[in-house]
Amino acid sequence: MSGRGAPATDGEHEDGTAGPRSRSDPAPAHRPERSPRRWSALVGVVAGLVLVAVAELASLAFGSSSAPFVAVGGGFVDVIPPAVKDLVIGLFGTWDKPILFASMFVVYALITAMIGQLASSRPVPAAAALGGLGLFAMAVVLTRAQNTPLDVLPTLLGTLVAVPTLLLLRRAVRGTTGAEPTASSEPTGAPDAAWLRRRSLVGVGLVGVLAVVVAAGARGVNAGRERARQVARFVLPAPRESAAPIPAGAQVDLTGMPPFVTPNDDFYRIDTALAVPNVDPGTWTLRIHGLVDEELELDFAALLEEPMTETHVTLTCVSNAVGGDLAGNATWLGVPVRTLLERAGVQDGADMVLSRSIDGFTASIPLEALTDSRDSLLAVGMNGQPLPAEHGYPVRMVVPGLYGYVSATKWLTELKVTRFADDTAYWTTRGWSERGPIKIASRIDVPRSFTELAPDSEGAVTLGGTAWAQQRGIAAVEVRIDDGDWREAELGADVSADTWTQW
C-alpha cells in the first residue's frame, strides 16, 4: 500500500544503485549516437572507390594508361626486385596481373578505411589525406612513358569528386542533425534516428556498389575496346615468302595434346604492361637510329608496303617452369628486320639493338640475331589474322632462338643500334643476362598433372609431350619413368628448327 505522493518505479538509478525511482529523480541523459568505427571505415572505402570509378570512367576518353590503378601498378612492377617477379610468375603464371590488381585493391581499401576512420573525428585532415592519395596517383601517371600531362585529368576528376563524397557520406552516417539531445528529450525520437541511420548506411553501401560496377565496367570497356580496335583494322598483305605447309604428322594423334599451332586466344602473355596500350596505327611510327649511316622513320602504311615473310616460330618465356605453359607456337607475318638494318647501314662496333615499346619497355637484342639468316621479324600478323592488341598490335618483334625478355618487344616504336657496353635494357638493369639464348626444353602434356591414369587393355599408359630448341631443332626425345630405363619417344613430323616438336 502506498501513501500519497509520486508513484514509484523499479529500476537502477543513474549512480548505479537499485531501488524505486520517483518523478523527482533526474531522468538519465540521452547520449548522442556516434558512428561505429567500422561504418567510418566503410565511408572511407566507398569514397576511395568513387575516386577509382570516376577516374576509370574518364580514362575511356584518354586511354587505359591514364587510369590510376594501371599507372600505379605499372610503377610498382618497375621497382619490385626481379626475384619477387620471378616468384610471382612462377606461382601464378598468366594470372600474375589479376593477382597484382587484387593485392593493390586490398592495400588501397586498407588505406582508405583508415582515412574514413580519421574523417569521423577530423574531417579536414581526412579530406587532405584522400586528396594526397589522388595527387600521388597523378604523379605516377606522369611517370609512365606513353602518358602526357593531360593523362592526369581522369585521376584529378576522380579526386575532386571523391573528397566531397567522403565528407557527405561522413555527415550522412553521423546523422542528419547536429543538435545535442538534452535531458528533456523525448525517448520516442530514438527509433526515428535509428531508422535514419540505417537508411544512411544503406545509401553508403549502394554508392559503394555503384562505384565498383562503374569501375569494373569502365575497365572492361577499356580492355574490350583495345581488342576490338585491331579487328578488321586492315587486310594483311600477302607474303613474298610464305611459310612451309605444316605436315599432318606434326600434330601427334593423342587425346589431350595441345594443337601444334597455338590459337591466338590461348597464346601465353607475359609482359610488363598492366593494360593493353592504346596505339593508333594512323600515328604510329618506327624510328631506327643510333650507330647507323642513315636514320630511318617509317609509318604503318609504309611498313605494310615492305616485302613480307611468313614463318612458323615458337616463342618461350624465360620464367617458364618445368612442365609450364609459357610457350606457344604461331605462324607470324612480318618484315625481316635485317632488310631495314641494311638500308640504314649499321656502323662498325655495334653489337646490340635496343628495341623500345610505347610503354617504355626495352629489350637488348644481339645484333647478329637480327642480321643473320634467321627469320627475325617486325610482325604485323599472327596465325593469319592482324596482330592481336594484347600480343603487340600494330607491330612487335619476333626473334627465333631468344627468350622473350631480350627480344619479344610488343607495341614496338623504336630500334636503336648500339653497344652492350653503352646501353642496358629493362631486364638487364635488374640483373638478367644480356643475350638470353633459349635452352633446350621438353615437357609432358599427356597425362596432365594429377590426372587419374587409365591404362589400356595391356596395362600401358601412353605419354605425349612437346620439346623445343629454337635455331637447333629436336633430334630425339627420351623418357624415363622413376628409376626405369630411358626410352626413346616417337617424334611428330619436323617443321623447322624454330618450332617445337611433338612426341
Language model segments and positions:
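Structured, non-membrane catalytic/scaffold regions adjacent to prosthetic-group chemistry
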Residues: L57, A61, S66, I99, ...
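Alpha-helical transmembrane segments of integral membrane proteins
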Residues: S35, W39, V43, A47, ...
